[in-house]
Amino acid sequence: MQKKYVVALDQGTTSSRAIVFDHDANIVSVSQREFTQLYPNPGWVEHDPMEIWASQSSVLVEALARAGIHSDEVAAIGITNQRETTVIWEKATGKPIYNAIVWQCRRSAEICEQLKAQGLEEYVRENTGLLLDPYFSGTKIKWILDNVPNAREQADRGELLFGTIDTWLVWKLTEGKVHVTDPTNAARTLLFNIHSLTWDNKLLEALDIPLSMLPDVKPSCSVYGTTRIAGEGSEIQVAGMAGDQQAALFGQLCVEPGMAKNTYGTGCFLLMNTGTKAVRSNHGLLTTVAVGPKGEVNYALEGSVFMGGATIQWLRDELGLIRDASDTEYFASKVADTNGVYLVPAFVGLGAPYWDPNARGALFGLTRGANRNHIIRAALESIAYQSKDLLDAMIKDSGVSLKRLKVDGGAVANDFLMQFQADITDVEVLRPSVCETTALGAAFLAGLAVGFWESVIELEHKACIDKHFIPNIDAQTRVQLYAGWQDAVARTRT
């Protein structure tokens, strides 16, 4: 039977999805299932790895069944995943020894402080591109080994395996035959040397993690093994995987140096491909691994905004100014400007490039004439201002002058926000027709790995732009608006 489809498994923080794409990169079928969030202590976040697998395997079956697709018609399954989340299981039984510790979890902060006290902060920055933070997997692994009964002894005997979610899914799909990750996920563990592209023995020793626990690192665009849907039908190749933000970068076909994408979700994630050069940031950005045009390792600069769509949720849930996120465009467009109002949504501090955990949110410029529309508009503009902060930092670090910014995520449906993003950055903003770019990136990697598609050049002909947003304000206005934002940010930090 002819191979007509590629399936992307998109394993996220709150839900598991399966999306079926045809040869023209159109979405044929989608299935999604949420799973339980566990908060056993303040600042702790966990998932049940078996529930993740159950949700992911069930949506795979559902997505194919809904479209009447037989396993014979599927060329490959690709994977993209929430990054950093940590699973440890028994090699012999496949049984997790503890819940998955989620990327958001802060329980290993003390371990990070111990590593800093050992003078490892600069070594980590130089060799992994990351900061010493509980966000990343390495300290989560150590916490499990130190706190779960018998875990340390089992690890020393070579009986335990570690994986981020991509590794866990491949292990389950291949029925325990394959223990593998890719460079984009390995680069988020705090254990991977992004220059030699190998596990770092010094960091493994510092965290007392046996090398035997770690997966093999295979290219993001390659075949890892085979699976059967619900144990039945023809074997399907499991091929191609990347962490969610790198998958989105590839899904947007940002495969050349200087190409960048911004994902507008609860927060914002801005990544710029820097090619074969790992650029070290002097502005608080992370250096990470990306995927090049032939599936090879490229590098990227990454910055994140803590409060993107979450700012709009605040307007709705806490202030009651809107009923639905989509209302913001209507209200913001009813006024010509914010009437001098700036909202700095530093509700949990400020991320890159400021990294100020003590900053707090504030509204500035309120006068008697300020109304709901001005505040809503200021909230939308704050998302664009924070993204400009990141973009300016990337341009300074990379020395590349950006001309176009590709965008994805839920908030890109807001035309006002996208136009203001173009205006304040003086960069053309491109919104794709298919905004499921994370899943699309996994599908592209899988399809390229098995020859379903021949090259990135072929994929470029399938990538359709829904709308171009062209900068439409003069330079003086842009400078004045941004100066007002910078002043507001400075005042939240004093």
Swiss-Prot record:
Catalysed reactions, semicolon-separated: glycerol + ATP = sn-glycerol 3-phosphate + ADP + H(+)
Residue positions binding sn-glycerol 3-phosphate: T13, R83, E84, Y135, D244
Record pathway: Polyol metabolism; glycerol degradation via glycerol kinase pathway; sn-glycerol 3-phosphate from glycerol: step 1/1
Binding site for glycerol: R83, E84, Y135, D244, Q245
GO molecular function: ATP binding; glycerol kinase activity
A single BP term in Gene Ontology: glycerol catabolic process
Enzyme Commission number: 2.7.1.30
Ligand binding (ATP): T13, T14, S15, T266, G309, Q313, G410
Matches recorded under PANTHER family: GLYCEROL KINASE, SUGAR KINASE
Protein name listed in UniProt: Glycerol kinase
Species the sequence originates in: Shewanella sp. (strain W3-18-1)
